[in-house]
Regions:
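C-terminal motif of bacterial Sec signal peptides marking the signal peptidase cleavage site
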Residues: 20-23
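Accessible peptide chain termini
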Residues: 1-2, 80
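Bacterial N-terminal signal peptides that target proteins for export
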Residues: 2-11
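Solvent-exposed, non-transmembrane regions of membrane-associated and secreted proteins
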Residues: 25-264
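Sec-dependent N-terminal signal peptides
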Residues: 11-17
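Residue-level signal for mature regions of secreted extracellular proteins and peptides
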Residues: 17-18, 228
């Protein structure tokens, strides 16, 4: 069961994907460009810090050229976009180390700013129960994921529901259902998301931590271990003991290819 299916059906009418779709298992179509209708795009809010786009790309103009991006860095497999924020950048996975993009930018150059990345335990096909995306806030709060903290504001949280993730040949739409601060421990190492029991435990713990400082969307309890979730995580340098996370559930898989085998 998916939450807000009427919204998902409406979004499907707005989303346009060019080319042959990709299949799960890290194999992708040869289509050069993935497009999304401009109606799903938004302008960066006044409170966000404007940063130079990576390689001139932006999902706000309704297209991502993955061929061009992979010529720059073959580790790029996706592009994340959250309307009304400065989060509009590539997502990478390094074959060298899970922490490579902690101190390297999306060009592969040494840079304390880092890049948005996933660990090797997650599939680049986005077929895991929970794909964890890491990004820095930065000392001056101008990092790639600094705007995640805006979701701590209940009004901003209520008004901004969606995360868009571009793959080569697909556009995935996620609805944000939780934003909160948690202990700074690795989700990938805390929960075994390859088993339903690990997925259930993650959701149970999320439910158990809800409180005044936690923003939750209505009907979030409908999210279960059979859904596909992304967790966006960041932290402030002066508060190394905790991390801020924004959790969203897949509500629209335009190409219809997201699937997985689940194990009890």
């Amino acid at each position: 069961m998916r939450i807000n299916m009427k919204k998902a059906e409406f979004l499907a009418l707005l989303v346009l994907v060019i080319g042959v779709v990709c299949a799960c298992g890290n194999t992708y179509a040869e289509e050069h460009t993935t497009e999304m209708s401009a109606e799903t795009s938004g302008n960066i809010g006044n409170d966000s810090k404007i940063r130079e786009s990576f390689a001139g790309e932006s999902a706000a103009d309704a297209q991502i050229d993955f061929d061009a991006l992979r010529e720059i860095n073959s580790d790029i497999f996706a592009w994340i976009y959250i309307p009304d924020t400065a989060i509009d950048c590539p997502v990478l996975q390094s074959e060298q180390s899970d922490t490579f993009y902690e101190d390297h930018n999306a060009y592969g150059e040494e840079d304390d700013t880092g890049a948005v990345y996933i660990e090797l335990a997650n599939l680049t096909s986005m077929c895991d129960f929970n794909t964890v995306l890491h990004g820095k806030t930065g000392a001056d709060e101008d990092g790639l994921f600094a705007d995640l903290y805006r979701f701590a504001n209940p009004e901003f949280f209520d008004d901004h529901e969606y995360v868009y993730l571009y793959l080569n040949g697909n556009v995935l739409t996620y609805e944000i259902f939780a934003a909160y601060e948690r202990e700074n421990t690795s989700l990938i190492r805390t929960y075994d998301f390859t088993y339903l029991s690990g997925c259930r435990q993650f959701l149970s713990d999320l439910y158990g931590t809800r409180g005044m400082a936690m923003n939750l969307r209505d009907e979030w309890e409908n999210v279960n271990e059979y859904h596909y979730v992304i967790t966006l995580t960041t932290q402030k340098e002066e508060n190394a003991e905790s991390q801020f996370v924004v959790v969203a559930v897949l509500i629209q898989d335009t190409a219809g290819t997201i699937n997985r085998v689940v194990t009890e």
